[in-house]
Amino acid sequence: MSFKGLKPIVYGGREVWPLVEGGKGVAATNHMSSGAWAAAGGIGTISAVNADSYDSEGKIVPQVYSALTRKERHQELIRYAIDGAVEQVRRAHEIAGGKGAININVLWEMGGAQEILEGVLDLTRGMVTGVTCGAGMPYKLSEIAQRYNVHYLPIVSSARAFRALWK
């Protein structure tokens, strides 16, 4: 594939087209769209916000919270989020067939963002190339990205926000 006037870049150790699927919230981008972007040589971006999980028949697993306390239900939410995002990454990686790159998108202000991000990155080592993050000031994201050897692509709303994150 070629694009007039556009040259590939090296991202995460592989040559890709500098075409990035925009990160969207709440399960808006999944393994199908992200895997297709990567298979075409671009950078697919999976929403790691309430991502879908599937049962053995390929049906979406409903996220049902059965715990009695708010704290326990929050832990259920985190578990669903990690399981769903990991499943989406694995499926996208398979569709990509070794081409392009896969990023994940998280909303820093969602409940349990850091725990979810670390859980997903821990279980998808070698499959995720970068993390985009908006909805808040993800001060700790650069440290997390460094620890997991992935790129950090913050979504910033202003020059002031950029300066604060750059410190």
Residue ranges and their predicted role:
Residues 1-167:
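Active-site entrance/lid segments in N-terminal catalytic domains of soluble metabolic enzymes
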